[in-house]
Amino acid sequence: MKINFYNRNFLKLLIILNFIGIVAAFYTYIPDIKKQVAAESYFLIPFFMVSVWLYLLAFFGTFYLHSRREFPIFFGGLIFLFSFVYGLGSLLFYPLFMFFVYGFSLYHFWNIFAHGFVGFQSVLFFRHLKKQKFYSFAPLVFLFLFYDFLGIFYGGFLYFTDFSFPFFLKMFLIYH
């Protein structure tokens, strides 16, 4: 039996699951949003909500696939890269986080599957991207570097601000 991952009903299911992911991820960030508002660090709010962006971009990606539209060049690249890097990166990050820092928790164990689910959707997105010129990757690379810079040096990466990481693990996660 062959499974068609581009079946419109399957894509509708992915759209619904990604929407649930957006709402659930936003709900988990409410205490952190309140902290940033109290500290008057409003500019960091969009940058630390990695999970919300992950599900939101996957939602748009599956919507484009469902509606049989072509991905815009920059937006399609952003959807793919964000889903690939942060989705599949969670398959590495959360086990290391639980092993070296926090210990086992159902919440972080669940995040392996929830974020990894979006990472595997990036494979669906990849097949529908237009080929890009090399120079068109520069804005995407700059955006990711800026996003990670704010995350690491301005407290946007909440795991680094809320937990004490061993030095070698922090360096590995920053430079992987």
What would you call each of these model-derived segments?
Residues 1-176:
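Aromatic-rich, lipid-facing transmembrane alpha helices and their immediate juxtamembrane interface loops
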